Amino acid sequence: METASDRRQAQAEQVDLGGLTPTYLITKRCFDFTASLIGLVLLSGVFLVLAILIKLDDPHGKVFYSQTRLGKDGRSFQMWKFRSMVAGADKMVDKLLKKNDVEGAMFKIKNDPRITRVGRVIRKYSLDELPQLYNVLRGDMSLVGPRPPLPREVIKYTNYDRQRLTVVPGVTGLWQISGRNDLDFPEMVALDIHYINNACVLEDIKILLKTVLVVVRPTGAY
């Protein structure tokens, strides 16, 4: 039986991949590779400082944290972050699901008890995402695109939601510069589809520049 939600999704913007020309995709990949390589080199000192702070704050866990995410066409890969939570945080998820602050197939808690002191700071300024430059270098991710979801989230996806998996996921995107965690899941999906349908080099550059401003003046990050 069709629900009101199904009808809203059917009437919403649908993905059109016609604008993703070979020229755009090749240019995007070349830029991603070059920018991520330069970023990893220039930010090596920042990586070292963050690694030391993470270890001093919580010496029992690792500096880096990898998590299985789903990329283009649902292909899985290991996404890297600086660890911002206590060791064994993944095992605590089931107990915290009822406290989810985000509507839809996504899990976020504003006052997540698993986050460490250093973790709270690096998450606020998105510094925990810096290791994803390695994912960009490998081609798992792009600098700009929809955020890669967890497998457990995709299980709950509708056919409409799955449209966000038709492109390479990104480190940043319209969601991050439009309110981030202040937006609910349906709004995030709508923004992702809008990005895919209007993707171009100029739009990617605009999103990257706005991301810098969001990092400097963080809102909706937790």
What are these regions (language model features)?
Residues 1-27:
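Flexible, Lys/Arg-rich cytosolic regulatory linkers and terminal tails that connect or flank
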Residues 32, 128-135, 192, 204:
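Acidic active-site catalytic centers that drive phospho-/nucleotidyl reactions
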Residues 19-90, 201, 207-222:
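A hydrophobic, helix-centered structural microdomain
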Residues 36, 51, 65, 116-120, ...:
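Positions in alpha-helical segments
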Residues 2, 18-23, 110, 160-222:
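C-terminal terminal-structure detector
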Residues 102-167, 208-215:
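A short, structured surface patch at a secondary-structure boundary
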Residues 2-8, 64-113, 172-190:
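Short, glycine-rich, amphipathic interfacial segments at transmembrane boundaries or analogous
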